[in-house]
Swiss-Prot record:
Organism taxonomic ancestry: Bacteria, Bacillati, Bacillota, Bacilli, Bacillales
Endpoints of the signal sequence: none
Disulfide-linked positions: none
Family: To B.subtilis YqbM.
Name of the protein this chain belongs to: Phage-like element PBSX protein XkdM
Pfam families: DUF2001
Length: 147
């Protein structure tokens, strides 16, 4: 069966949860896994081989600035050495697509940096971009594979 336009998934039909709390002020979210590879030179071959030796999880979340949560997390680390790890769950749920729901859970999420202050005379809504790393992930619910 062919792809139909209504089967595509709207990026607006999503939610993000931080330790079970919905982060309603999320604007964009992206998590990536990149494999770590070592080069392997092989006798008699001109092309370099590659062996996967591990993986690295990174991502970025952009929020509308409506809370001081990330500023306070960074301040707690700087002042007290407290560096918490979290669980994030991204949910895609575009009912009109007929594809079902996808849930991706990231474990041991640690935020890398936070904008501690921002002013912008031209901004209609201030935003804060928060890069992070994670150490494991799971897909407890996946989209349909068939049309």
């Amino acid at each position: 069966m062919a792809l139909k336009a209504q089967n595509t998934i709207s990026g607006k039909e999503g939610r993000l949860f931080l330790d079970g709390e919905e982060m309603a002020h999320i604007k964009t979210f992206e998590a990536n896994v990149e494999k770590n590879k070592s080069e392997v030179n092989i006798m008699g071959r001109r092309m370099t081989g590659h062996k996967t030796t591990g993986a690295n999880g990174t991502g970025t979340a952009t929020f509308y600035k409506v809370t001081s949560k990330f500023v306070l997390l960074m301040m707690d680390y700087v002042k007290k050495g407290s560096d918490p790890y979290f669980t994030l769950q991204a949910v895609l749920d575009d009912q009109s697509s007929g594809r079902g729901t996808e849930r991706v859970t990231l474990y041991d999420v640690n935020f890398d940096s936070a904008k501690i202050a921002s002013l912008d005379v031209d901004s209609e809504a201030l935003e804060e971009e928060v890069p992070f790393t994670f150490e494991d992930f799971d897909v407890p619910e996946k989209l349909s594979d068939t049309f």
